[in-house]
Amino acid sequence: MPAVAGRADRVIAASLDLERILSLVRPSATSLVSMFHGEDHWRQVASIGLDLAARTPGCDPIVVVLFALLHDAQRIGDDPDPPHGARGAALARSLDLGRFGFSREQLALMEAACRDHTGGGLSDDPTIGTCWDADRLTLWRVGIEPAARYMSTAAGREAAASGRRFACVSDWAEVARRLG
């Protein structure tokens, strides 16, 4: 079933394939257990991203979840590692995620979001902007207060300006449920 067929089909496909995709990412992940950049962080970015996506017209929540899974998967340690986003995008390409029914456009957006997420820039694309905002709204975990001026979307700016903290989800099944 294609992940992009229609809203209901997309949600079902993503829910069914999320664990399979994770099973491909985990063995290649260099930061899996990192307290700052590991799988708990990926899940938090996915959860925040889904909150923001629901309030961002034109945002593709599937891409946001894929970004969350891959953006820090190739990070080496918790010290500065600027090329880790490009390595995450390369990992995504190597996994041949198109076989799960994602469109070329979705995969290109996810790769661009991964590749460029550490540059500190803003994006006019609602999906890429949501990805970056979701990651930046977790900066408090490394002692940095998220700032509205570094958010690409209205939802991200509002969350940063208010100091909002997002509820964490405890497992990927909850992320998959929230795609609906």
Predicted regions mapped to residue ranges:
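Divalent metal-dependent phosphate-bond-processing catalytic cores, especially two-metal-ion Mg2+/Mn2+ enzymes
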Residues: M1-L16, T30-G58, L70, G98, ...
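Short coil-to-beta-strand
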Residues: L16-I21, C59-L66
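An amphipathic alpha-helix signature
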Residues: L18-L22, A46, G85-R93, E111
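Generic N-terminal amphipathic, Lys/Arg-enriched alpha-helix
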Residues: I21-S31
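Active-site metal-coordination segments of metallo-dependent hydrolases
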Residues: L32-Q44, R75-A90, R104
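His-Asp-centered metal-binding catalytic motifs of divalent-metal-dependent phosphohydrolases/nucleases
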Residues: P61-P80, H84, G88, M110-T118, ...
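Short, charged helix-to-loop "capping" segments that act as catalytic/coupling loops
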Residues: G77, L95-F100
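Internal alpha-helical transmembrane segments of multi-pass membrane proteins
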Residues: F102-E105, L109
